[in-house]
C-alpha cells in the first residue's frame, strides 16, 4: 500500500519553504492546489514541481463542491487542470467525476486520471453504483472517500472495494471511510484492495487522516512476517 501525503501551500513563499526531507518516507506527493487563489496556481506550480523533482506527484484541485477550498465553474476547473498538465505532466491528475461530469469528455485522452468522488456528509445509498460507473471508465485510479454515519457504512465501503477489486484486478482503487469512525479503512486498505492511504504531516487534508509516523508504525506491524 502506497503512502500519500499532501502539500498545501497558500502562497509562493510557503511553497518555496517546504521541507522536502519530511516526505522522504512518502510514496506519492499530493499537491492540493485549491489552498491557493485561482490566479496564483500556475505561478506557484514551478516551486512545487522543482521541490519534488523526481518524485511522483498527484495534482489535485479539490473544489468546494467536494469539500475543497476553491470555487470554479466546470470550464474553469478543466481548463486549469489541462494547463497544469500541458506544462508539467504530473504523474496523476485528480478529477472530481460526479461534480464535473459535464466536462469529463475533455479528459478522455488523459491516461493518468484519478477519478474521484468525495462526500463529507454521508455514505450514500447508491455507493455501489458510484463504484460501478467510475470503474467502467477504467482510469488509472478510482478514488472514493465518504463519511460514515455507522460502523456498517465503514464495512460497506470496504466490502465494495474488495468486491470491485476482485472483479477488476487490473484496476487500482484508493478508498477510505473518513473521520474517526472510518479510520480502520485507512489502515486495512491492503486487505480489501485499496492501493493508497492518505496521511497527514503538519496538517490533515481530510478528516480521520493518520499521521505519517503512526502509519509507518502500523504498516510495519501489519506487514511484518513475525
Swiss-Prot record:
Record-linked CDD domains: DHQase_I (cd00502)
Chain positions recorded as 3-dehydroquinate binding sites: 30-32, 62, 186, 205, 209
Molecular functions per Gene Ontology: 3-dehydroquinate dehydratase activity
Keywords from the named record: Amino-acid biosynthesis, Aromatic amino acid biosynthesis, Lyase, Schiff base
Entry annotation: catalytic residues: 118, 143
Enzyme nomenclature, EC number: 4.2.1.10
Catalytic activity: 3-dehydroquinate = 3-dehydroshikimate + H2O
UniProt cross-references to SUPFAM superfamilies, sorted A to Z: Aldolase
Protein family membership: Belongs to the type-I 3-dehydroquinase family.
Protein name: 3-dehydroquinate dehydratase
Name of encoding gene: aroD
Amino acid at each position: 500500500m502506497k503512502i500519500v501525503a499532501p502539500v498545501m501551500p497558500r502562497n509562493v513563499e510557503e511553497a518555496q519553504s517546504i521541507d522536502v526531507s519530511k516526505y522522504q518516507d512518502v510514496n506519492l506527493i499530493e499537491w492540493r492546489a485549491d489552498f491557493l487563489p485561482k490566479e496564483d496556481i500556475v505561478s506557484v506550480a514551478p516551486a512545487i514541481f522543482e521541490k519534488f523533482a523526481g518524485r511522483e506527484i498527484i495534482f489535485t484541485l479539490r473544489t468546494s463542491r467536494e469539500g475543497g477550498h476553491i470555487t470554479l465553474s466546470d470550464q474553469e476547473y478543466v481548463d486549469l487542470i489541462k494547463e497544469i498538465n500541458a506544462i508539467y505532466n504530473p504523474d496523476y491528475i485528480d478529477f472530481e467525476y460526479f461534480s464535473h461530469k459535464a466536462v469529463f469528455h475533455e479528459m478522455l485522452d488523459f491516461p493518468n486520471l484519478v477519478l474521484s468522488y468525495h462526500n463529507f456528509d454521508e455514505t450514500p445509498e447508491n455507493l455501489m453504483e458510484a463504484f460501478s460507473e467510475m470503474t467502467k471508465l477504467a482510469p488509472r485510479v478510482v478514488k472514493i472517500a465518504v463519511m460514515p454515519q455507522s460502523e456498517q457504512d465503514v464495512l460497506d465501503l470496504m466490502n465494495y472495494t474488495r468486491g470491485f477489486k476482485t472483479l477488476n484486478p487490473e484496476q487500482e482503487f484508493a478508498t477510505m471511510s473518513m473521520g474517526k469512525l472510518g479510520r480502520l479503512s485507512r489502515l486495512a486498505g491492503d486487505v480489501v484492495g485499496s492501493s493508497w492511504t492518505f496521511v497527514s504531516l503538519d496538517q490533515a487534508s481530510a478528516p480521520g487522516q493518520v499521521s505519517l509516523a503512526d502509519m509507518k508504525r502500523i504498516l510495519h506491524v501489519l506487514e511484518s512476517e513475525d
